[in-house]
Amino acid sequence: MSNYIETAFMQQRTDFMKTLPDRRKRFSIPDGVDMYLDIEYVNDQNEAHRLDVFRPSESPDKELPIIFNVHGGGLIMGCKEFNRYFCARLCKLGYVVFSIEYRLVPEYTFYLSLIHI
């Protein structure tokens, strides 16, 4: 049974990720947002330990409130790129937004998925 569930999750994740290029075309980042992409936040060369930072262009030296965005997907699917437009819109409201990637189940245990969030 667990192999069936794991296979279903993996297929759902694959199907979900196929929509990423179309989402990038439909949702452009608004002007006035500086993006810093794929910054390593754990020194282990794991692609799942990257974050994106969104900062309003017009206030590079100003202290601003921070939002940490953790993408949804029940720890089994999703990626920070799916929330890129949402994070940019929050940035336009005057926030610095950190959007993190994290390890997913079943490649990693539930605990290892949560430890860096």
Outline where the language-model segments fall.
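N-terminal cap/lid segment of alpha/beta-hydrolase-fold proteins
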Residues: T14-D61
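Short beta-to-alpha linker loops that shape the active-site pocket of alpha/beta-hydrolase fold enzymes
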Residues: S57, V96, E101-V105
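Short beta-strand element of the alpha/beta-hydrolase
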Residues: E63-G72
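Conserved catalytic-core motifs of eukaryotic protein kinase domains, centered on the activation segment
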Residues: C79-E81, T109-F110
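Short amphipathic alpha-helix adjacent to the substrate-entry channel of hydrolases
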Residues: E81-F98
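Glycine-rich "HGGG/HGxG" loop immediately N-terminal to the catalytic nucleophile
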Residues: L104-L112
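Conserved small/polar residues in nucleotide/adenosyl-binding loops
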Residues: I115-I117
